[in-house]
Protein backbone atom coordinates (compact mmCIF):
# COMPACT_ATOMS: atom_id res chain seq x y z
CA UNK A 1 0.00 0.00 0.00
CA UNK A 2 1.41 3.39 -0.95
CA UNK A 3 1.63 6.44 1.26
CA UNK A 4 -1.58 8.46 1.48
CA UNK A 5 -1.89 11.09 -1.23
CA UNK A 6 -3.06 14.66 -0.80
CA UNK A 7 -6.68 13.71 -1.48
CA UNK A 8 -6.62 11.16 1.33
CA UNK A 9 -5.01 13.73 3.63
CA UNK A 10 -7.74 16.24 2.73
CA UNK A 11 -10.53 13.80 3.54
CA UNK A 12 -8.84 12.67 6.76
CA UNK A 13 -8.66 16.37 7.71
CA UNK A 14 -12.36 16.84 6.90
CA UNK A 15 -13.37 13.71 8.86
CA UNK A 16 -11.33 14.78 11.87
CA UNK A 17 -12.65 18.34 12.03
CA UNK A 18 -16.27 17.44 11.24
CA UNK A 19 -16.64 15.15 14.24
CA UNK A 20 -19.59 16.05 16.41
CA UNK A 21 -19.86 15.17 20.08
CA UNK A 22 -22.47 12.56 20.94
CA UNK A 23 -25.92 13.99 21.64
CA UNK A 24 -25.78 13.14 25.33
CA UNK A 25 -22.33 14.64 25.90
CA UNK A 26 -23.49 17.20 28.46
CA UNK A 27 -23.01 20.93 28.75
CA UNK A 28 -19.95 21.38 26.46
CA UNK A 29 -21.74 19.56 23.63
CA UNK A 30 -24.89 21.64 24.11
CA UNK A 31 -22.82 24.84 24.11
CA UNK A 32 -21.18 23.71 20.85
CA UNK A 33 -24.59 23.08 19.27
CA UNK A 34 -25.78 26.55 20.32
CA UNK A 35 -22.67 28.10 18.77
CA UNK A 36 -23.31 26.09 15.60
CA UNK A 37 -26.85 27.48 15.39
CA UNK A 38 -25.63 31.05 15.94
CA UNK A 39 -22.84 30.60 13.35
CA UNK A 40 -25.34 29.33 10.77
CA UNK A 41 -27.72 32.24 11.32
CA UNK A 42 -24.82 34.71 11.22
CA UNK A 43 -23.41 33.23 7.98
CA UNK A 44 -26.81 33.27 6.28
CA UNK A 45 -27.40 36.86 7.37
CA UNK A 46 -23.99 37.97 6.07
CA UNK A 47 -24.91 36.51 2.68
CA UNK A 48 -28.26 38.33 2.72
CA UNK A 49 -30.24 35.09 3.04
CA UNK A 50 -33.19 34.60 5.38
CA UNK A 51 -32.22 32.35 8.29
CA UNK A 52 -35.25 30.07 8.10
CA UNK A 53 -35.14 26.64 9.67
CA UNK A 54 -34.72 25.07 6.22
CA UNK A 55 -31.84 27.44 5.40
CA UNK A 56 -30.15 26.64 8.73
CA UNK A 57 -30.59 22.92 8.02
CA UNK A 58 -28.93 23.29 4.63
CA UNK A 59 -26.18 25.53 6.04
CA UNK A 60 -25.04 22.95 8.57
CA UNK A 61 -26.01 19.78 6.73
CA UNK A 62 -28.71 18.35 8.97
CA UNK A 63 -32.37 17.53 8.44
CA UNK A 64 -35.15 20.06 8.94
CA UNK A 65 -36.40 18.55 12.20
CA UNK A 66 -32.91 18.62 13.71
CA UNK A 67 -32.44 22.22 12.62
CA UNK A 68 -35.83 23.12 14.09
CA UNK A 69 -34.83 21.69 17.48
CA UNK A 70 -31.44 23.41 17.27
CA UNK A 71 -32.90 26.82 16.41
CA UNK A 72 -35.52 26.45 19.15
CA UNK A 73 -32.86 25.58 21.74
CA UNK A 74 -30.73 28.57 20.72
CA UNK A 75 -33.79 30.83 20.94
CA UNK A 76 -34.69 29.46 24.39
CA UNK A 77 -31.09 30.13 25.48
CA UNK A 78 -31.49 33.74 24.34
CA UNK A 79 -29.02 33.61 21.44
CA UNK A 80 -31.58 33.82 18.63
CA UNK A 81 -34.85 35.66 18.16
CA UNK A 82 -37.52 34.05 15.99
CA UNK A 83 -39.93 36.21 14.03
CA UNK A 84 -41.90 36.43 10.83
CA UNK A 85 -39.88 36.67 7.63
CA UNK A 86 -39.90 40.10 6.02
CA UNK A 87 -40.18 38.47 2.58
CA UNK A 88 -42.94 36.02 3.50
CA UNK A 89 -44.84 36.56 6.73
CA UNK A 90 -45.85 32.88 6.80
CA UNK A 91 -42.21 31.87 7.24
CA UNK A 92 -40.30 32.20 10.49
CA UNK A 93 -36.71 33.33 10.49
CA UNK A 94 -34.03 33.62 13.12
CA UNK A 95 -31.84 36.59 13.93
CA UNK A 96 -28.97 36.92 16.37
CA UNK A 97 -29.67 38.64 19.65
CA UNK A 98 -27.05 40.71 21.46
CA UNK A 99 -26.37 37.62 23.59
CA UNK A 100 -25.93 35.64 20.37
CA UNK A 101 -23.40 38.17 19.07
CA UNK A 102 -21.52 37.92 22.37
CA UNK A 103 -21.61 34.12 22.12
CA UNK A 104 -20.11 34.31 18.61
CA UNK A 105 -17.45 36.81 19.68
CA UNK A 106 -16.40 34.44 22.47
CA UNK A 107 -16.48 31.43 20.13
CA UNK A 108 -14.39 33.26 17.53
CA UNK A 109 -11.83 34.26 20.20
CA UNK A 110 -11.63 30.59 21.24
CA UNK A 111 -11.25 29.49 17.59
CA UNK A 112 -8.33 31.90 17.15
CA UNK A 113 -6.66 30.58 20.31
CA UNK A 114 -7.04 26.99 19.06
CA UNK A 115 -5.55 27.96 15.67
CA UNK A 116 -2.66 29.72 17.44
CA UNK A 117 -2.01 26.64 19.59
CA UNK A 118 -2.18 24.21 16.65
CA UNK A 119 0.13 26.34 14.49
CA UNK A 120 2.58 27.24 17.24
CA UNK A 121 6.07 27.32 15.79
CA UNK A 122 4.82 28.11 12.27
CA UNK A 123 5.97 31.28 10.58
CA UNK A 124 3.38 34.00 10.06
CA UNK A 125 3.70 33.39 6.33
CA UNK A 126 2.92 29.67 6.69
CA UNK A 127 -0.09 30.48 8.88
CA UNK A 128 -1.45 32.98 6.31
CA UNK A 129 -0.84 30.52 3.45
CA UNK A 130 -2.65 27.76 5.33
CA UNK A 131 -5.57 30.10 6.04
CA UNK A 132 -5.69 31.08 2.37
CA UNK A 133 -5.52 27.44 1.26
CA UNK A 134 -8.49 26.57 3.49
CA UNK A 135 -10.43 29.56 2.15
CA UNK A 136 -9.60 28.58 -1.43
CA UNK A 137 -10.82 25.02 -0.85
CA UNK A 138 -14.10 26.29 0.59
CA UNK A 139 -14.61 28.59 -2.40
CA UNK A 140 -13.73 25.91 -4.94
CA UNK A 141 -16.08 23.42 -3.31
CA UNK A 142 -18.97 25.77 -3.89
CA UNK A 143 -19.76 25.72 -0.20
CA UNK A 144 -21.17 28.93 1.19
CA UNK A 145 -19.07 30.67 3.78
CA UNK A 146 -19.18 33.85 5.79
Regions found by a protein language model. Give the residues of each.
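C-terminal regulatory/oligomerization modules of transcriptional regulators
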Residues: 1, 128-146
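Short, locally clustered residues in the helix-turn-helix/winged-helix DNA-binding domain
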Residues: 39-46, 108, 135
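Helix-turn-helix DNA-binding elements, focusing on the entry/boundary residues of the two helices
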Residues: 52-53, 71
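The alpha-helix within a helix-turn-helix
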Residues: 57
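Key DNA-contact positions within bacterial/archaeal DNA-binding proteins
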Residues: 65
Amino acid sequence: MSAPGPGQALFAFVRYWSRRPPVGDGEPAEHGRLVLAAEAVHALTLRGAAATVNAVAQEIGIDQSGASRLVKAAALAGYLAIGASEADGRQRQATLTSAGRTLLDQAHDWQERVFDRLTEGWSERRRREFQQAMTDLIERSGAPHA
